[in-house]
A protein has these predicted regions:
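Cytosolic regulatory regions built on CNB/CRP/Popeye-like sensor folds
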Residues: 1-120
Length: 120
């Protein structure tokens, strides 16, 4: 499943320049992002904990939990992002179970990488 193809719409693409914050820890959230091109760093307590590249996504946790942002997201390079709002996200989960599985797999992969980093 290629998320950029599902959510791509020229009117929907958000261009973000290198070094630009996308959101900050503690911000209210209303959308997740799919990376169409470029890279985004996820930063927690001043440390890069994940770099998300093309076809990856970030910001989904706050949509699922309806919570504040848990980390900062900063454009590592110039990038094109596809925002997915809560309404569209929930619609996709209802209508395309494989989308929900894709998101869960991405979250599980991220958790596994975090566990490996914590182990040393």
């Amino acid at each position: 499943m290629k998320l950029p193809e599902i959510f791509a719409s020229p009117a929907n693409v958000r261009t973000v320049l290198q070094g630009t914050p996308i959101f900050s820890k503690g911000d209210e959230s209303g959308e997740m992002y799919v990376v169409q091109s470029g890279e985004v760093d996820i930063v927690l307590n001043g440390k890069i904990v994940e770099t998300v590249g093309p076809e990856g996504f970030f910001g989904e946790i706050s949509l699922i939990e309806d919570s504040l942002r848990s980390a900062d997201a900063v454009a590592r390079s110039d990038c094109k992002l596809l925002p997915v709002n809560r309404h569209h996200f929930l619609f996709m989960v209802d209508e395309m179970p494989q989308f929900a599985l894709h998101v869960m797999k991405g979250m599980a992969d991220r958790l596994r990488r975090a566990d490996k980093r914590a182990e040393g």
